[in-house]
UniProtKB/Swiss-Prot annotation:
Chief location bin: cytoplasm
Region of interest (G2), ranges: 60-64
Protein origin, superkingdom: Bacteria
Summary of the function given for this chain in its UniProt record: GTP hydrolase that promotes the GTP-dependent binding of aminoacyl-tRNA to the A-site of ribosomes during protein biosynthesis.
Coiled-coil zones: none
Secretion signal span: none
Family of the protein in this entry: Belongs to the TRAFAC class translation factor GTPase superfamily. Classic translation factor GTPase family. EF-Tu/EF-1A subfamily.
Protein name: Elongation factor Tu
G1: annotated segments: 19-26
Cellular compartments per GO CC: cytosol
Source organism (scientific name): Chromobacterium violaceum (strain ATCC 12472 / DSM 30191 / JCM 1249 / CCUG 213 / NBRC 12614 / NCIMB 9131 / NCTC 9757 / MK)
Binding site for Mg(2+): 26
UniProt-recorded Gene Ontology molecular function terms: GTP binding; GTPase activity; guanosine tetraphosphate binding; translation elongation factor activity
Compartment(s) where it occurs, according to its Swiss-Prot or TrEMBL record: Cytoplasm
Length: 396
């Protein structure tokens, strides 16, 4: 029989499991794939397959992540699970796995623990928009009042980080029982309840192509008789011939007009998210544009120099610094396609930052970058990556 073509008829949503070590994230991931594959097709993955997560690199940082896929009645999900706490921090900060929603796994027997809190905070800082809770190991709790207490604790914790704790779906169950095929409420049915919560609570994400046009400029050429061409990969949206655009970052924002789009030496009438294109600009001089700026739909992105960020500083073993850094440390910040020097200030009471730390910092760049909350960057010293970060809040 011919290999079936991958039919992308259902909308695609990216999710992942978060939560404290040993609360059952990987067991739950195995249970979801196993149980949903029986009903909707797809591939079941067992615990050991997920736990032996392969290494991958994102922004010069090595991360262990397991990727699984599953289907529900209405959607196709791509799901990430990380073996260690440090992998979660790195994954979420580098944006290696952008999540449209997260499944917070919390053991009903233990209640919220330090990493439960840390992962919720991280989700808030890196812009994970929705969290659903799976209260795991509920089969080990005999007292219904105790379950209610843990549920209240989790809701309060979510609310304290500006998630809607009172409205968050909480599914109570046992991933282990579900994996063993148990048909009680705690077993397989809890996985179907979780799938329903995912389907109904996380809205279908806006596709990259439907967002406002943005292209990080990688190179600039001058074509005699035609004008200036900028090249790069369209990050989001669509650009059409004849549209007015803005060039943002590094200098004052200027307006320009797209007079042509080229891909593989062919002229097109438009370029869209994912395309590597050359965009011909009218009335723009070659020397007015440079790598590191962005070409964008007018009014959709602005240049900034000051921001708050959540960063992960590479450990010595990961090829990072061997020594701590202090306030006023001035590395380069690599945004999209270029490095910009900036000065770091630390939170009050924080004397220094050690390699391997995950901290909140404030940054002031020497030149403005087209920026929005959620933008990822690398921290570099002389071309070597020493950290990764995400813009949590723009100051100026």
């Amino acid at each position: 029989m011919a290999k079936e073509k991958f039919e992308r008829t259902k909308p695609h949503v990216n999710v992942g499991t978060i939560g404290h070590v040993d609360h059952g994230k990987t067991t739950l991931t195995a249970a979801i794939t196993t149980i949903l594959s029986k009903k909707f097709g797809g591939e079941a993955k067992d615990y050991s397959q997920i736990d032996s997560a392969p290494e991958e690199k994102a922004r010069g940082i090595t991360i262990n992540t397991a990727h699984v896929e599953y289907e529900t009645e209405t959607r196709h999900y791509a799901h990430v699970d990380c073996p260690g706490h440090a992998d979660y921090v790195k994954n979420m900060i580098t944006g290696a796995a952008q999540m449209d929603g997260a499944i917070l796994v919390c053991s009903a027997a233990d209640g919220p623990m330090p990493q439960t809190r840390e992962h919720i905070l991280l989700s808030r800082q890196v812009g994970v928009p929705y969290i659903i809770v799976y209260l795991n190991k509920a089969d080990l709790v005999d007292d219904a009042e105790l379950l209610e207490l843990v549920e209240m604790e989790v809701r309060d914790l979510l609310s304290s980080y500006d998630f809607p704790g009172d409205d968050t779906p909480i599914v109570t169950g046992s991933a282990r029982l579900a994996l063993e095929g148990d048909q009680s409420e705690m077993g397989e049915p809890s996985i179907f309840r979780l799938a329903d919560a995912l389907d109904s609570y996380i809205p279908t994400p806006e596709r990259a192509i439907d967002k406002p046009f943005l292209l990080p400029i990688e190179d600039v050429f001058s074509i005699s008789g035609r004008g200036t061409v900028v090249t790069g990969r369209v990050e989001r949206g669509i650009v059409k011939v004849g549209e007015e655009l803005e060039i943002v970052g590094l200098k004052d924002t200027v307006k320009t007009t797209c007079t042509g789009v080229e891909m593989f030496r062919k002229l097109l009438d438009q370029g869209q998210a994912g395309d590597n294109v050359g965009v011909l600009l009218r009335g723009t001089k070659r020397e007015d544009v440079e790598r590191g700026q962005v070409l964008a739909k007018p009014g959709t992105i602005t240049p900034h120099t000051k921001f708050e960020a959540s960063v992960y500083v590479l450990s010595k073993d990961e090829g990072g610094r061997h020594t701590p850094f202090f306030a006023n440390y001035r590395p380069q910040f690599y945004f999209r396609t270029t490095d910009v020097t900036g000065a770091i200030s630390l939170a009050e009471g924080v004397e220094m930052v050690m390699p391997g730390d995950n901290v909140e910092i404030k940054v002031e760049l020497i030149a403005p970058i087209a920026m929005e909350e959620g933008l990822r960057f690398a921290i570099r010293e002389g071309g070597r990556t020493v950290g990764a970060g995400v813009v949590a809040k723009i100051i100026a």
